[in-house]
Amino acid sequence: MEKKKYFISVDLEGVTDVTAWCETEKGQDGYERSCLQMTSEAAAACRAVLEAGYDAVVRDGHDSARNLRHELLPRGVKLMRGWACHPGSMMAGIDGSYAGAIYIGYHAPGGSNGSPLAHTMNYKVIRSVKINGKLASEFTMNSLYAAEQGVPSVFISGDASICRLAAEEVPGIGTVAVKECRGNSTFNMHPEDVCDMIQEEVAKALRKEVAVRRVDPELELEVSLTSHQAVRKALMHPLIRQIDDSTVCYRAHSPRELNAILDYIIG
């Protein structure tokens, strides 16, 4: 039977106009406006999925995972809110029944200069993450987790840096770069233009064949941490090793295991 639903993982830092940390944190200046645009961009992806005859399931993947306005998404869209203490993290809920994964509002990885909000998972604890020697983003980890379930990653929107990195990791993936980032500034597309482009490009992506990305049998994880205390805590795990004063490593054998170790390190 043909698969009839798409999984849409939504973050906030890669949404158009979002530039400063305060705009991503509940109760801070600009947060509510950011959430409305986050919802609008997710809704644009949903419309493309629904118009193609599929169901859309949205996973709120930012901070508390309680940012999206469900009533502003198209009727029929199901929304996952909050955290389930699951190694899927921003992809918790995806399984082999999905036809593909879509990523909205994604951002450059920690350790890069691709965005003033560049980070991987928790910027207060983690400086950067590498997998098998290459700088890894949240998209890297999430698309690997989707691949473990047999699900291809078909589309991503966010800053220009993450779109370039995603295209390198998953050839053929559809992209919409909503902003260019220069130092602590962002050069943004108009919010309504962004939504139009996301809907149009997601529709195109659904008509393409994108292969499930390859998952290496061993995933050598290197995590650069922001404090000596974070390093000491990580080393309480018997299989985590120290590389230098601020970096620890772990050899995982699946994306699920890799995500679980990262959750442990963040604490």
Predicted region positions:
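Glycine-rich nucleotide/cofactor/substrate-binding loop typically near the N-terminus or early
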Residues: 17-19, 42-96
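C-terminal accessory domains and tails appended to enzymatic cores
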Residues: 4, 181, 194, 199-267
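Hydrophobic alpha-helical transmembrane segments
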Residues: 1, 7, 17-20, 28-30, ...
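Short glycine-enriched loops at secondary-structure junctions
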Residues: 9-15, 62, 104-110, 160-161
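Active-site glycine-rich loop that binds ribose-phosphate moieties when present
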Residues: 123-149, 157-161
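N-terminal glycine-rich phosphate/adenylate-binding segment common to multiple enzyme folds
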Residues: 81-124
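Active-site rim beta-loop-alpha module in soluble metabolic enzymes
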Residues: 145-206
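Short catalytic helix/loop segments, enriched in acidic residues and glycine
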Residues: 22-47
